[in-house]
Amino acid sequence: MSLRGKNVTVHDMTLRDGMHPKRHLMTLDQMVSIATGLDEAGIPLIEVTHGDGLGGSSVNYGFPAHTDEEYLGTVIPKMKNAKISALLLPGIGTVDHLKMARDLGVHTIRVATHCTEADVSEQHITMARKLDMDTVGFLMMSHMNGAEGLVKQAKLMEGYGANCIYVTDSAGHLLPEGVKERLGAVRKALKPETELGFHGHHNLAMGVANSIAAIEVGANRIDAAAAGLGAGAGNTPMEVLIAVCSLMGIETGVDVAKITDVAEDLVVPMMDFPIRIDRDALTLGYAGVYGSFLLFAKRASAKYGVPARDILVELGRRGMVGGQEDMIEDTAITMARERGLKV
């Protein structure tokens, strides 16, 4: 089908999902440099927070170089056209965090839950709407729920007041057919005025293909990150997505050359290691494991002598989901003991 002339809002993840491979240690100067570059390139919406959202600073998830208030308060005044969003996971972020973000000028709040637990988002979505924010319901790990189940969860979030619903491939596990099945069903079930979004990861190199598949069935918000900087093998690479959209006639309002320069000149030099599909990132996608588990598994591997790939496969077998990072070390210890390794 032709998508020529279709308008899509691209939402940048470099400064939020990209915090995972940076161990949440981006400097304020790095944040401002990349955000202003994205703004200049025409990116309309940029997410800025700890990798695990507002309030994510903790022993479990990692301590950032600066507070959410410092990151947001530094970046927002520098924006000429782009709006700033923030992620919030109920149980990590609170209503007070939400109000703080709004007072600092955050435009969009994305309330994220596991794809079967939308009911825990009611308080935060309701409050965000009362504060007149662009309010997004964000269903994570969507490969773990079928189309019918996702429809029920999406309708809950819409009922709480969300004006946009995201179906999120947190593990980079879905293929285009699975994306179309899930997002197509959700699109048909939502009110016409409720927007639909897709967030992809590149663990099986499907980020761009899945994003186009999502657009084909009605998604009009698409997440991506410059140079793919994000958890696992990264998010959908923004510069590649923009180039493909341009070739297909999909309107994003983003300059291909400028976003490519942001990726090449600003983001790649900042990487602590190459964001690529190595064997462990591939295992994330293949086994359907939450993307931010990757570095935790690698650290546990170095500590206990169990290959990270084996740990990730076991986490997938156990059905571990985002928020259970503390179980990764426990799993590695159990596996090491079973293999007769010294713990």
Curated annotation (Swiss-Prot):
Site residues (Transition state stabilizer), renumbered to this chain? 16
TM stretches of this protein? none
Cytoplasm among keywords? no
Q: Does the keyword Metal-binding apply?
A: yes
Q: Which residues form the Pyruvate carboxyltransferase domain?
A: 8-260
Any one GO MF annotation of this record: 4-hydroxy-2-oxovalerate aldolase activity
SUPFAM superfamilies membership? Aldolase (SSF51569), post-HMGL domain-like (SSF89000)
Reactions catalysed, semicolon-separated, are: (S)-4-hydroxy-2-oxopentanoate = acetaldehyde + pyruvate
Set out the biological process GO terms recorded for this chain's protein: catabolic process; L-leucine biosynthetic process
InterPro entries associated with the record? 2-IPM_HCS-like, 4OH_2_O-val_aldolase, Aldolase_TIM, DmpG_comm, DRE_TIM_HOA, PYR_CT
State the active site. Answer: 20 (proton acceptor)
Q: Which Gene3D superfamilies match?
A: 1.10.8.60, Aldolase class I
Assigned EC number = 4.1.3.39
Q: Which domain of life is it from?
A: Bacteria
Please list the residues that bind substrate: 16-17, 170, 199, 290
User: What are the alphabetically sorted keywords of the record?
Assistant: Aromatic hydrocarbons catabolism, Lyase, Manganese, Metal-binding
Q: Where does Mn(2+) bind?
A: 17, 199, 201
UniProt similarity note: Belongs to the 4-hydroxy-2-oxovalerate aldolase family.
The name on file for this protein is 4-hydroxy-2-oxovalerate aldolase 1
